[in-house]
Amino acid sequence: MELLSALSLGELALSFSRVPLFPVFDLSYFIVSILYLKYEPGAVELSRRHPVASWLCAMLHCFGSYILADLLLGEPLIDYFSNNSSILLASAVWYLIFFCPLDLFYKCVCFLPVKLIFVAMKEVVRVRKIAVGIHHAHHHYHHGWFIMIATGWVKGSGVALLSNVEQLLRGVWKPETNEILHMSFPTKASLYGAILFTLQQTRWLPVSKASLIFIFTMFMVSCKVFLTATHSHSSPFDVLEAYVCPVLFGTGSGGDHPQDNHGAWPGGPPSGALATKSKEELSEGSRKKKTKKAD
């Protein structure tokens, strides 16, 4: 805290945490979320043939984190849909991205410098949602650390965690794309951020919430803008995980097990090959015996 005061970041962080998200930041969040929906294979054809299904997918991209958080806390799943302003704004963005003449709106928001601004503003919303989700969970479960972490995590990455449900709405089933099995950078960052905000909420992290929001937002904005600008799908956590995971969890490689062939010795032929070889040897022995009898 002394360092933050010396750098005069305390007042800046407090002012930043009080900036309202609606409508500018929420608009950016909706634009980027529905852009990612349009990138999905078959999304454009779905919007032409089944516009209601396409709209539902867009709403899930925009509000999936709220739905999943309400599910965890036992609250009505459609509670957030009572916010008419947000629903209408997200619906307008969906219509412009998919149905604007000549794709003018889509081309404008996809222009890289403009898109980077929207991506940065979306990360501001993501971090604020994590902080609000943990505060909400703390109100119900004062000592439920894991509940607070889970709620903050889904508030930050609920859309990705519900990707399989969204795929079903589009008539696609890809269980191998489960986000928990293959976490993207935003999902991992939301989890780590949820842990940090939980420690701050329970007073184990000696920093104000406004300062933590500001610092973590700057980290998320910098990383996501860089990854988007370079069209990279890697994660800044990969280097750290490459050192930590083998120590804590082992190599995690399925090919390192010595008995992957159900009991066969490593380096030896598979059991099917051994069985085939044995049959060939028996057949050869029988043939030799018959030859001797004939002689």
From Swiss-Prot:
<feature type="binding site">
    <location>
        <position position="126"/>
    </location>
    <ligand>
        <name>a 1,2-diacyl-sn-glycero-3-phospho-(1D-myo-inositol-4,5-bisphosphate)</name>
    </ligand>
</feature>
<feature type="transmembrane region" description="Helical;Name=5">
    <location>
        <begin position="179"/>
        <end position="199"/>
    </location>
</feature>
<keyword id="KW-1133">Transmembrane helix</keyword>
<feature type="transmembrane region" description="Helical;Name=6">
    <location>
        <begin position="210"/>
        <end position="230"/>
    </location>
</feature>
<feature type="transmembrane region" description="Helical;Name=2">
    <location>
        <begin position="52"/>
        <end position="72"/>
    </location>
</feature>
<keyword id="KW-0539">Nucleus</keyword>
<protein>
    <recommendedName>
        <fullName>Trimeric intracellular cation channel type A</fullName>
    </recommendedName>
</protein>
<comment type="subunit">
    <text>Homotrimer; conformation seems to be controled by binding to diacylglycerol (DAG).</text>
</comment>
<feature type="region of interest" description="Disordered">
    <location>
        <begin position="256"/>
        <end position="295"/>
    </location>
</feature>
<feature type="transmembrane region" description="Helical;Name=3">
    <location>
        <begin position="86"/>
        <end position="106"/>
    </location>
</feature>
<feature type="topological domain" description="Lumenal">
    <location>
        <begin position="1"/>
        <end position="18"/>
    </location>
</feature>
<feature type="topological domain" description="Cytoplasmic">
    <location>
        <begin position="256"/>
        <end position="295"/>
    </location>
</feature>
<feature type="topological domain" description="Cytoplasmic">
    <location>
        <begin position="200"/>
        <end position="209"/>
    </location>
</feature>
<dbReference type="InterPro" id="IPR007866">
    <property type="entry name" value="TRIC_channel"/>
</dbReference>
<feature type="binding site">
    <location>
        <position position="74"/>
    </location>
    <ligand>
        <name>Ca(2+)</name>
    </ligand>
</feature>
<comment type="function">
    <text>Intracellular monovalent cation channel required for maintenance of rapid intracellular calcium release. Acts as a potassium counter-ion channel that functions in synchronization with calcium release from intracellular stores. Opened by a change of voltage within the sarcoplasmic reticulum lumen.</text>
</comment>
<keyword id="KW-0106">Calcium</keyword>
<feature type="compositionally biased region" description="Basic and acidic residues">
    <location>
        <begin position="277"/>
        <end position="286"/>
    </location>
</feature>
<dbReference type="GO" id="GO:0031965">
    <property type="term" value="C:nuclear membrane"/>
</dbReference>
<keyword id="KW-0479">Metal-binding</keyword>
<keyword id="KW-0631">Potassium channel</keyword>
<feature type="topological domain" description="Cytoplasmic">
    <location>
        <begin position="107"/>
        <end position="144"/>
    </location>
</feature>
<comment type="similarity">
    <text>Belongs to the TMEM38 family.</text>
</comment>
<feature type="transmembrane region" description="Helical;Name=4">
    <location>
        <begin position="145"/>
        <end position="165"/>
    </location>
</feature>
<feature type="topological domain" description="Cytoplasmic">
    <location>
        <begin position="40"/>
        <end position="51"/>
    </location>
</feature>
<feature type="transmembrane region" description="Helical;Name=1">
    <location>
        <begin position="19"/>
        <end position="39"/>
    </location>
</feature>
<keyword id="KW-0703">Sarcoplasmic reticulum</keyword>
<dbReference type="GO" id="GO:0042802">
    <property type="term" value="F:identical protein binding"/>
</dbReference>
<dbReference type="GO" id="GO:0033017">
    <property type="term" value="C:sarcoplasmic reticulum membrane"/>
</dbReference>
<dbReference type="Pfam" id="PF05197">
    <property type="entry name" value="TRIC"/>
</dbReference>
<keyword id="KW-0472">Membrane</keyword>
<feature type="topological domain" description="Lumenal">
    <location>
        <begin position="73"/>
        <end position="85"/>
    </location>
</feature>
<feature type="topological domain" description="Lumenal">
    <location>
        <begin position="166"/>
        <end position="178"/>
    </location>
</feature>
<keyword id="KW-0813">Transport</keyword>
<keyword id="KW-0630">Potassium</keyword>
<dbReference type="GO" id="GO:0005267">
    <property type="term" value="F:potassium channel activity"/>
</dbReference>
<feature type="topological domain" description="Lumenal">
    <location>
        <begin position="231"/>
        <end position="234"/>
    </location>
</feature>
<keyword id="KW-0406">Ion transport</keyword>
<feature type="binding site">
    <location>
        <position position="122"/>
    </location>
    <ligand>
        <name>a 1,2-diacyl-sn-glycero-3-phospho-(1D-myo-inositol-4,5-bisphosphate)</name>
    </ligand>
</feature>
<keyword id="KW-0812">Transmembrane</keyword>
<keyword id="KW-0407">Ion channel</keyword>
<feature type="transmembrane region" description="Helical;Name=7">
    <location>
        <begin position="235"/>
        <end position="255"/>
    </location>
</feature>
